[in-house]
Amino acid sequence: MTKSELIERLATQQSHIPAKTVEDAVKDMLEHMASTLAQGERIEIRGFGSFSLHYRAPRTGRNPKTGDKVELEGKYVPHFKPGKELRDRANIYG
């Protein structure tokens, strides 16, 4: 599901709320989450999961075109850990 599809589905389900208001709310929420992570803070949504930053240590990689070794710097990357309720709902085949 894309952001546009999410907005469209929410606007359809909440027909009493203008679609533009739904779009603004979704965009504001995602922007706030991104800026919170950029500040190094953790986000926890009970029953859904948590977002945090994980550190990737410096390492030697390879250029996929040439095969040459490339030194990659350490960096922080976003990480999502699903909550138990989300894991249970997603486990429809188990």
UniProtKB/Swiss-Prot annotation:
InterPro entries: Hist_DNA-bd, Histone-like_DNA-bd_CS, IHF-like_DNA-bd_dom_sf, IHF_beta
Keywords (A to Z) from UniProt: DNA recombination, DNA-binding, Transcription, Transcription regulation, Translation regulation
A Pfam family reported for this protein in Swiss-Prot or TrEMBL: Bac_DNA_binding
Matches recorded under CDD domains: IHF_B
Keyword tRNA processing in record: no
Domain of life: Bacteria
SUPFAM superfamilies registered for this protein in UniProt: IHF-like DNA-binding proteins (SSF47729)
GO molecular function: DNA binding; structural constituent of chromatin
Gene Ontology biological process terms in this record: DNA recombination; regulation of DNA-templated transcription; regulation of translation
GO CC entries: chromosome; cytosol
Keyword tRNA-binding: no
Family according to the record: Belongs to the bacterial histone-like protein family.
PANTHER family associated with the record: DNA-BINDING PROTEIN HU, INTEGRATION HOST FACTOR SUBUNIT BETA
Known role: This protein is one of the two subunits of integration host factor, a specific DNA-binding protein that functions in genetic recombination as well as in transcriptional and translational control.
Subunit structure of this chain's protein: Heterodimer of an alpha and a beta chain.
Protein name: Integration host factor subunit beta
Organism from which the protein derives: Escherichia coli O127:H6 (strain E2348/69 / EPEC)
